[in-house]
Amino acid sequence: MPVGIIINALSIVIGGILGAFAGHKLSPKFKEDITLVFGVCSMGMGISTIGLMENMPAVIFSIVIGTGIGLAIHLGERINAGAGAMQRVIGKFIRNSNSEFSEDEFMNTLVTIIVLFCASGTGIYGSIVSGMSGDHSVLISKSILDLFTAAIFACSLGMVVCMIAIPQVIIFLILFFAATAIFPLTTPGMINDFKACGGFLMLATGFRMVKLKNFPTADMIPAMVLIMPMSWFWVTYILPLVS
């Protein structure tokens, strides 16, 4: 059962409601500082899972080649375009009622949070791990961050933030059930290398959140596809030759 996905979606809805009704009481400094804490939490989650790595060369190769593929096909731009399409659908139901934003600023911010909630490396990784192993801890930890992130964005955008839970659930459920089908073909070593690869994405996401370095996290997503085949290939063919 996709418990983590359900909890994550509910956290966005609850955060959106709280932010829309009570967000005006939060100071700009509070919003900025709490976002920095979110970044540190993401880094900590990443570091903890990187420690599970069993085949470092396979993980590093997957991250480098996967990111190269993502950059070559402009995956980040395509994800933004997809978010723009979602934004147009959502915008038909809820319009900008906040005078602080122009219509363009409202739509651009909405696209940003659609990408953040629906296409982040942490969410994709957490959904796949949840489907493969039943471990919902990544998504539950992400839910805590998303609760407050949704509240902060809802301070400015209003109730529209709650609606982002709908496309998020659809995307994460597809990943969850696909991972469930793949799991019988995996080994414990492949799973650990996959978790470590996801840890690098969470670490990069943390750096972005604290605005220390703008890593291309969306373009790093193909590494999540490469890592398990690469881990299997490394253990089966390369490791016997070098050991």
Task: Place the predicted regions along the sequence by residue.
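Interfacial loop-to-transmembrane junctions
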Residues: 207-226
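Structural signature of hydrophobic alpha-helical transmembrane segments
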Residues: 1-14, 61, 127, 131-144, ...
